[in-house]
């Protein structure tokens, strides 16, 4: 029995890393939609018309308990891409452009070391001075479809339609009746 166990242990140690399944390396899609709250159909907003996001939420993962560590786009992206609380690295203010300590890497760097194909389409403003080398592609044409067959991927797609800079485009038409919009209790 101990010889069988020893053989099994040696086999797992020698070949175990090649037995990775898709569940252990799931594909990851990060869709950035900035500067808004949970006003989407998948979160129960009856006025929101968000059929594509709703379909993704139904088939994928929907976070029901989340918050932003930063109230504006670039510092929030810094938090997500580094996993760091913004004040802990000096990135809490818009346009902080901090120098990250060498031991803090963007997580696509780690994912690439694990065999992932990493794409960024296409915001590169992470509120830090360094640019990551964690991408296989980073442009408005970057896409996970360019990876090797069977290779797991991490893909960021950035939507700009909800970005704060878009709310000042004039003239604009009212899409909803303001009287029907639910104002969260934390607003005055």
Language model regions located:
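Bacterial N-terminal signal peptides
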Residues: 6-18
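Formylglycine-dependent sulfatase
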Residues: 2-5, 19-188
